[in-house]
């Protein structure tokens, strides 16, 4: 308790304080009694002390401070030695103390009450400032609680948003996987279709190739059938056989299937054309429809072209044009008879061929180019494809001479 100053004690009872000790000393016929007031917060007991004053009524001074009390050296000495005659004088002092207390009370006024100080009141009941502080503290606590609740709500919202984000991420990943799977399936289907299309294309190509081969074979067969049809036509020449017998080559062969093929050379054609009259083609055209109705087996012979224009073609092509092969097919027995007749006439043709050639040489200038070439080939001459008619006539004339 920080308190300093001078005051007069008029009461023998001071609450919250105790009297440590009391000694009485006499100086110049004055008896004084000092009080040492010490704070005692732990105990509630109070001791009563009475003040004694000298007859001249002189008051005593009590000073108190926060640092404690200052001891009077005289008072400390008195405390050491003590009052030996305190008990002896106690009876006489009581009356004097009562009188002094009355005098002090009348002089100093009302009693000094320490409980009325503001610090005792502050400890007993809170003041307005303390109430304001408590209210402010409560407000701060409420604000802090509100902030904590808001933070918790924000955390919950963030967690919910994160959960939604995770869900959206999972959904996106699933969509990506599904898209990849669908793309792979589409690629596989496309590859399968392409492979099937390639296989089908290969099969179609194979079928086309086989079809082309078959059609080409059929065309060849048809061409062969059209180029060499079986015919029962027999050409009747007005020229007797004895004068101009046909000369067959030794290459004629007979097949087992009752068919034979005879190769005619240009020589034979030229001899027959030379012996036949000029009106033979018209005669043939006139008698062709009548002979077609005849069922008998005959042989066919193609005539060479009436005129042959000189062209810059190879020697082999001309030989192919000159050589014409005929295949006559027949199943009747008459064909064998014709063959036997032809075989008999071969010998006669060989004998008469020399005579026919001698007669033909006389009129070489009247013959055509094709006929001249046939004669030259029959004589074994070569390199005739590029020669003209005059050159051939000279060659044949020089050869015959």
Swiss-Prot record:
An example Gene Ontology biological process: chloroplast mRNA processing
Any Pfam family matching the protein: Rho_N
Residue spans of biased composition, Polar residues class: 102-126, 210-223, 240-265
Positions of the UniProt region annotated as Disordered: 73-129, 180-361
Composition bias type Acidic residues, residue spans: 339-358
Keywords recorded for this protein, A-Z: Chloroplast, Coiled coil, Plastid, RNA-binding, Transit peptide
GO molecular function terms noted in the UniProt entry: mRNA binding; rRNA binding
Coiled coil: 339-371
Transit peptide segment: 1-63
Localization annotation: Plastid, Chloroplast
Major localization listed first in the record, in broad terms: plastid
Superkingdom field: Eukaryota
Recorded GO CC terms: chloroplast; extracellular region
Biased composition (Basic and acidic residues): 266-290
Disruption phenotype: Smaller and albinotic phenotype. Increased number and decreased size of chloroplasts. Seedling lethal when homozygous.
Subunit record text: Homodimer or homomultimer. Part of a chloroplastic degradosome-like complex. Interacts with RNE.
Its biological purpose: Binds to and supports processing of specific plastid RNAs. Associates via its C-terminal Rho-N domain to single stranded regions of 16S and 23S rRNAs or to rbcL mRNAs. May be involved in targeting transcripts to RNases such as RNE or RNase J.
PANTHER family: RHO TERMINATION FACTOR, RHO-N DOMAIN-CONTAINING PROTEIN 1, CHLOROPLASTIC
Name of protein: Rho-N domain-containing protein 1, chloroplastic
Organism whose genome encodes this protein: Arabidopsis thaliana
């Amino acid at each position: 308790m920080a308190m300093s100053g001078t005051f007069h004690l008029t009461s023998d009872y001071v609450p919250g304080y105790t009297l440590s000790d009391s000694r009485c000393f006499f100086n110049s016929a004055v008896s004084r009694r000092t009080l040492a007031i010490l704070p005692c917060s732990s105990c509630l007991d109070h001791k009563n002390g009475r003040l004694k004053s000298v007859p001249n009524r002189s008051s005593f001074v009590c000073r108190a401070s926060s640092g404690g009390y200052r001891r009077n050296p005289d008072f400390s000495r008195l405390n050491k030695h003590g009052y030996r005659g305190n008990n002896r004088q106690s009876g006489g002092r009581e009356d004097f103390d009562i009188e002094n207390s009355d005098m002090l009370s009348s002089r100093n006024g009302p009693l000094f009450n320490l409980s009325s100080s503001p610090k005792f009141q502050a400890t007993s009941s809170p003041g307005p400032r303390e109430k304001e502080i408590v209210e402010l503290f409560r407000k701060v606590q409420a604000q802090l609680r509100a902030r904590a609740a808001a933070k918790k709500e924000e955390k919950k919202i963030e967690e919910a948003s994160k959960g939604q984000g995770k869900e959206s991420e999972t959904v996106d990943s699933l969509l990506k996987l599904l898209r990849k799977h669908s793309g792979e399936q589409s690629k596989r289907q496309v590859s399968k279709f392409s492979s099937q299309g390639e296989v089908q294309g290969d099969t179609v190509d194979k079928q086309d190739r086989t079809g082309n081969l078959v059609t080409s074979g059929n065309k060849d067969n048809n061409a062969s059938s059209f180029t060499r049809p079986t015919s029962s036509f027999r050409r009747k020449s007005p020229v007797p056989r004895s004068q101009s017998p046909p000369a067959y080559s030794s290459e004629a062969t007979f097949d087992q299937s009752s068919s034979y093929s005879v190769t005619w050379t240009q020589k034979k054609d030229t001899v027959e054309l030379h012996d036949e009259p000029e009106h033979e083609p018209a005669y043939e055209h006139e008698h062709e429809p009548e002979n077609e109705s005849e069922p008998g087996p005959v042989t066919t012979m193609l005539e060479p072209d009436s005129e042959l224009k000189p062209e810059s073609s190879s020697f082999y092509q001309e030989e192919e044009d000159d050589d014409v092969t005929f295949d006559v097919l027949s199943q009747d027995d008459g064909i064998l008879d014709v063959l036997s007749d032809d075989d008999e006439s071969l010998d006669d043709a060989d004998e008469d061929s020399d005579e026919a050639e001698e007669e033909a040489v006389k009129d070489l200038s009247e013959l055509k180019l094709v006929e001249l070439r046939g004669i030259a080939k029959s004589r074994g001459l070569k390199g005739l494809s590029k020669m003209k008619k005059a050159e051939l006539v000279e060659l044949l004339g020089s050869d015959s001479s």
